[in-house]
Design a protein with these regions (language model features):
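N-terminal secretory/targeting leader peptides
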Residues: 1-46, 55, 62-266
């Protein structure tokens, strides 16, 4: 099923566990959406340090509890990039009016609206057909995923934007979790820790040659420069302002301070 449907099933207890895009989980637990704010991390190393920080994880777990979820870790879908069938995207204005498939989550919808695109939420399994039938002009997924899922067969323009890092929280139904022994719970947590390490390593390998593979398919690939990223970051300021109000100053400021602090460490 789609992510939203699976999350509803975990909440209801018909599914015991799922890994879900933070943006989709934010429909149930708004505060976790902060993980996927656009252009918020300067680089992947900083992002991992923040997301693996014990205080950050404890807070995420606390936000999930009242909604019937137990947070035990993440899976990862890498930094996201953009592909489309119309033209290269090098600046926010290039997104004007483009119908872009987005994750069914508020941060994604608001990000692309703010950048001038026409965000179209669709479940992941429907992307290829929607691109092929020109229901949408483009989509955002890691370039590695776009090559793997053959989106680059129908979208010949790609931009390595690294705009949103998709770490997918692994959530377990609270009732099911309570039925487990402490030893069983420990096994679940340990498995989640091994899984994210393997996941991140695999993504790094896959991403390393994604540009080369896309170019071999005659895809026009543009990589945002640091200057380009700054222009995009300024353009999404209204998204930060809106979600600071939703998450509350305390959680937002705490998270941003963690990013600042870790970005200064070598």
């Amino acid at each position: 099923g789609g992510e939203r449907s699976m999350t509803e099933q975990v909440q209801a207890g018909t599914l015991h566990m799922t890994a879900v895009t933070s943006g989709v989980l934010a429909n149930f637990v708004p505060e976790v959406g902060i993980i996927e704010l656009p252009f918020i991390y300067p680089d992947k190393k900083t992002a991992y340090r923040v997301l693996d920080d014990k205080d950050v994880q404890q807070r995420i777990a606390k936000f999930c509890e009242p909604k019937g979820f137990v947070f035990i870790g993440y899976t990862e879908n890498e930094f996201r990039d953009m592909t489309n069938s119309k033209h290269p995207i090098k600046k926010p204005q290039d997104l004007q009016g483009l119908k872009i498939r987005v994750v069914e989550g508020p941060v994604f919808i608001d990000t692309f609206k703010t950048l001038g695109a026409n965000p179209t939420p669709l479940p992941f399994p429907e992307i290829y057909n929607a691109l092929q039938q020109k229901v949408i002009d483009g989509q955002d997924n890691p370039l590695y995923t776009s090559v793997l899922m053959k989106f680059t067969e129908v979208n010949k323009f790609a931009t390595v934007t690294n705009h949103i890092l998709t770490e997918c929280p692994v959530v377990v139904n609270a009732k099911f979790w309570k039925s487990l022994t402490p030893e069983q719970q420990k096994i679940f947590r340990e498995a989640a820790a091994v899984q994210i390490k393997t996941n991140r390593e695999g993504n790094a390998k896959g991403s390393a040659d994604a540009i080369q593979k896309a170019k071999a398919q005659k895809v026009d690939v543009y990589v945002l420069t640091a200057k380009d990223r700054e222009v995009f970051r300024k353009a999404v300021q209204p998204v930060y302002d809106k979600y600071k109000g939703i998450y509350g100053n305390e959680w937002y400021d705490f998270f941003v301070k963690k990013i600042d602090s870790y970005s200064k460490k070598k």
